[in-house]
UniProtKB/Swiss-Prot annotation:
InterPro entries: 2-oxoA_DH_lipoyl-BS, Biotin_lipoyl, GCV_H, GCV_H/Fam206, GCV_H_sub, Single_hybrid_motif. CDD domains: GCS_H. This is Probable glycine cleavage system H protein. Belongs to the GcvH family. HAMAP family: GcvH. The keyword Membrane does not apply. One of its GO terms (cellular component) is cytoplasm. It comes from Halobacterium salinarum (strain ATCC 29341 / DSM 671 / R1). PROSITE patterns: BIOTINYL_LIPOYL, LIPOYL. Its cofactor is (R)-lipoate. The glycine cleavage system is composed of four proteins: P, T, L and H. The glycine cleavage system catalyzes the degradation of glycine. The H protein shuttles the methylamine group of glycine from the P protein to the T protein. Binds 1 lipoyl cofactor covalently. The modification N6-lipoyllysine is found at K63.
Amino acid sequence: MSFDVPDDLQYLESHEWIDPATGRVGISEFAQDELGDVVFVELPSVGDALDQHDELGVVESIKAVSDLYAPVSGEVTAVNDALTNEPELVNEAPFGDGWLVEIDFDSDDLEATLDSDDYRAQIA
């Protein structure tokens, strides 16, 4: 199966993505497929400080409970509150309405992330 891996995003080996232009973070299409139907998402609060690769939340599916990791260090500037009542958005639109948080971050942190080609190779 082929998964969508947008070229304009950066990725973690743990399957989170970040949009370098906006700081928006989510999980990849591959990750949501592996998880199965998402039934609950726990996220940080606006204003919380995150360190790169530290836990930023939890996603619970019918198959598993998985930790979510911060692709960069920074301050949470927005949280996708829609996921409280519609966690299935993570499955339906992992790169769209299923985003998790937005982070104000230092672009130097992107050096420790994967580009789309490297991420595609990881999930192949």
